[in-house]
Amino acid sequence: MTTIVSVRRNGQVVVGGDGQVSLGNTVMKGNARKVRRLYNGKVLAGFAGGTADAFTLFELFERKLEMHQGHLLKSAVELAKDWRTDRALRKLEAMLIVADEKESLIITGIGDVVQPEEDQILAIGSGGNYALSAARALVENTELSAREIVEKSLKIAGDVCVFTNTNFTIEELPN
């Protein structure tokens, strides 16, 4: 798996992820790019789960964004509907965190769309709970920027989770 975390603070949203690709107990690659910009750089997206499945979902989500003029929630709900009803999509094993300047969402592998708690922190993947806990503690107890919180949360997850490394890709809006 992996770790993807998103923090929204002081007018910025940051999504970051590690670069480890594992096959069973073997590390296959350490520098995968699991966080990307979509829709002309206006949407951030990060994935956890099967790499090929995630790229399929990135493509489908970007099509939904184009179809709905970049409306994040509408695009996510439409993707989730397709994910639940299409036989081929139902077999995809991945989760996405998506964010624009206004909102952040998780799109789950069973076709659910989840909005964050009031703290605007989201995390997915095998190290997601570690990163989420770290990010919440840092938001509540420091004045760090959203980017610094994402970096530190990923570092903590990478130190604890064997399926997460410390080779990070981090994107932020506004840029």
From Swiss-Prot:
SUPFAM superfamilies: N-terminal nucleophile aminohydrolases (Ntn hydrolases)
Keyword Hydrolase: yes
Activity regulation remarks: Allosterically activated by HslU binding.
UniProt record, GO biological process: proteolysis involved in protein catabolic process
This enzyme's EC code(s): 3.4.25.2
Record InterPro entries: ATP-dep_Prtase_HsIV_su, Ntn_hydrolases_N, Proteasome_sua/b, Proteasome_suB-type
One GO term describing the cellular component: HslUV protease complex
Top-level taxon: Bacteria
Catalytic activity from the UniProt record: ATP-dependent cleavage of peptide bonds with broad specificity
GO molecular function, a single term: metal ion binding
Positions with a binding annotation for Na(+): 158, 161, 164
Subcellular location: Cytoplasm
Keywords from the UniProt entry: Allosteric enzyme, Cytoplasm, Hydrolase, Metal-binding, Protease, Sodium, Threonine protease
Active site: 2
Main localization category: cytoplasm
Xref: PROSITE patterns: PROTEASOME_BETA_2
Gene3D superfamilies xrefs: Glutamine Phosphoribosylpyrophosphate, subunit 1, domain 1
Family, as annotated: Belongs to the peptidase T1B family. HslV subfamily.
Function (record text): Protease subunit of a proteasome-like degradation complex believed to be a general protein degrading machinery.
Subunit structure: A double ring-shaped homohexamer of HslV is capped on each side by a ring-shaped HslU homohexamer. The assembly of the HslU/HslV complex is dependent on binding of ATP.
UniProt-listed HAMAP family: HslV (MF_00248)
Protein name: ATP-dependent protease subunit HslV
